[in-house]
């Protein structure tokens, strides 16, 4: 006799970034089924929380169902939190070397990687935010340069790019935020 199947949450993760999708699936599945849809959503300027809430509301309206969105910051302490939620544009314009050059005049190379996920059950449902933070420092690029700023963000002696994917998925800002999401979904399942 087979075990009864348990109901699983299904989330539609809104991203066009295959690396992010892979990490989210590796962390959440099989407990939460992750589907994917790439939508071109205009991002407002604001705090990370404002950007994530707005993106989540608009995605839920477009999809007409439950959505999961994510926004990431890389905050340089010497620059009072910049580039922050604008890291994507800084990275595209400056690259790894340019980001390092922003800190050339500063002794403080410390930084925070911040990930905020927004979940909405659908149109008209207020998004819920889940945030994870990892402290590290900015270093010259090490490791494969194929996932954003992973090659310049060092955590306990290794850049994210140098880490095994499974190891990174245990300690990263994204993993910490997703752990909070998983905890919330687990409570919802028993409610």
UniProtKB/Swiss-Prot annotation:
Q: What is its EC number?
A: 3.6.1.66
What does the entry list as the binding residues for ITP? 15-20, 55, 71-72, 88, 147-150, 168, 173-174
Tell me which residues bind Mg(2+).
43
The free-text cofactor remark is: Binds 1 divalent metal cation per subunit; can use either Mg(2+) or Mn(2+).
Name the Gene Ontology molecular function terms of this record.
dITP diphosphatase activity; ITP diphosphatase activity; metal ion binding; nucleoside triphosphate diphosphatase activity; nucleotide binding; XTP diphosphatase activity
The organism's superkingdom is given as Eukaryota
A Pfam family it matches:
Ham1p_like
Alphabetized UniProt keyword annotations? Cytoplasm, Hydrolase, Magnesium, Manganese, Metal-binding, Nucleotide metabolism, Nucleotide-binding, Nucleus
Functional description taken from the UniProt entry: Pyrophosphatase that hydrolyzes non-canonical purine nucleotides such as inosine triphosphate (ITP), deoxyinosine triphosphate (dITP) or xanthosine 5'-triphosphate (XTP) to their respective monophosphate derivatives. The enzyme does not distinguish between the deoxy- and ribose forms. Probably excludes non-canonical purines from RNA and DNA precursor pools, thus preventing their incorporation into RNA and DNA and avoiding chromosomal lesions.
Q: Which family does it belong to?
A: Belongs to the HAM1 NTPase family.
Protein name, as recorded: Inosine triphosphate pyrophosphatase
